[in-house]
């Protein structure tokens, strides 16, 4: 089986976790893999799309194509699998009107014409089902060889509440900052560590700022005592696939999250982490975890187990291979 994967950039987290980390497994199981960046100019597009007939399957990662361009690609590809891990059919959080006609038109046009869709969560699956019944949920997964549980905390002053992410999601942490500042006035024994390419300031809470790098990501995660994933409850956020939580679980951290979208599936409230639905719950649950080291450790162990059982590369790579083989072998004409 020959597959062409079209991606935005190997530097993008989504590409690494949804596509590139699966490539070694696919090759080990006899799949010929070719990786291509999405072309920018029409000559580049015609050049690439003209080669697609040689592949059994073309895998597109999270791009919404203009209908005319997608139709040109569709005519050249035997089979198309589309991978989606964000609510691309909506505008991002904070927009006055989350609905976008242009995005919806592109999304609907593509979904009606691809052979199969791999969705990162059940919300995205439900969006796809309006147009195409050939869809399966494959959660974002971690290669556990790159993550080990942090050792017991050494004696140190205070607790580190950690947040790791991209600048585009820093707004969710900004919304949590007043709660952290209010909590610090009551319990001034913690610091906030932000691992990102952008940062926040606080005149109340001590903030440690660390530029994100792939090489130091695991080390930075292990410097946290508690991992947080605040979100807003909107259509865009419901499409998120919980990568932060999985990374926290990877090093055995307890997690507090807003129970939106897949967060509700990954985190079992009170078992491997806590849900925080409002400011009061954020305060109460952060305080409880900061004061109880044994609880932090127990939740972290359960979180790691959750990761191993349902969100690991070892579990989900065979599932992806099975999906791709099934689509490539399907009889009948493409849409």
Language-model segments: residues:
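Conserved catalytic-core segment of nucleotide-activated headgroup transferases in glycan assembly
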Residues: 10-25, 143-149, 154-223
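Membrane-proximal helix-turn-helix segments that form the acceptor-binding/catalytic region
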Residues: 46-53, 68, 72-76, 88, ...
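Active-site proximal beta-strand in glycosyltransferases
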Residues: 58, 73-91
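Carbohydrate-associated surface elements
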Residues: 123, 141
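Nucleotide-sugar-dependent
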Residues: 171, 215-250, 257-265
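Conserved acidic donor-binding segment of nucleotide-sugar-dependent glycosyltransferases
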Residues: 269-280, 288-294
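A short, well-ordered alpha-helix in the C-terminal region of glycosyltransferases
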Residues: 288, 295-310, 316-319
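C-terminal alpha-helical cap of glycosyltransferases
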Residues: 313-335
């Amino acid at each position: 089986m020959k597959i062409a994967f079209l991606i935005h950039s190997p530097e993008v987290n989504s590409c690494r976790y949804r596509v590139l980390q699966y490539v070694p497994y696919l090759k080990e199981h006899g799949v010929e893999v070719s990786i291509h960046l999405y072309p920018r100019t029409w000559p580049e597009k015609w050049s690439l799309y003209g080669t697609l007939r040689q592949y059994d399957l073309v895998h597109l990662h999270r791009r919404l194509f203009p209908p005319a361009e997608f139709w040109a690609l569709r005519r050249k590809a035997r089979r198309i699998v589309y991978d989606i891990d964000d609510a691309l059919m909506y505008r991002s959080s904070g927009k006055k009107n989350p609905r976008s006609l242009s995005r919806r038109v592109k999304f609907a046009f593509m979904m009606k014409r691809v052979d199969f869709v791999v969705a990162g969560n059940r919300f995205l699956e439900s969006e796809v089902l309006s147009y195409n019944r050939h869809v399966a949920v494959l959660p974002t997964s971690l290669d556990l060889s790159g993550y080990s549980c942090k050792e017991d905390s050494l004696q140190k002053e205070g607790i580190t509440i950690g947040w790791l992410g991209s600048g585009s999601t820093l707004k969710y942490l900004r919304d949590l900052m007043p709660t952290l500042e209010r909590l610090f006035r009551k319990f001034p024994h913690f610091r906030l560590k932000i691992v990102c390419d952008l940062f926040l300031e606080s005149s109340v809470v001590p903030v440690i700022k660390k530029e994100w790098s792939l090489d130091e990501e695991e080390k930075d995660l292990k410097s946290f005592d508690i991992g947080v994933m605040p979100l807003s409850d909107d259509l865009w956020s419901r499409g998120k696939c919980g990568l932060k939580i999985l990374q926290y679980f990877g090093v055995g951290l307890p997690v507090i999250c807003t129970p939106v979208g897949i967060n509700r599936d990954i985190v079992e409230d009170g078992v491997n982490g806590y849900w925080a639905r409002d400011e009061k719950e954020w305060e109460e649950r952060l305080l409880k975890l900061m004061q109880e080291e044994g609880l932090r450790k127990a939740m972290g162990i359960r979180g790691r187990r959750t990761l191993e059982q349902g969100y690991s590369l070892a579990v989900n790579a065979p599932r992806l291979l099975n999906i791709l083989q099934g689509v490539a072998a399907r009889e009948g004409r493409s849409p």
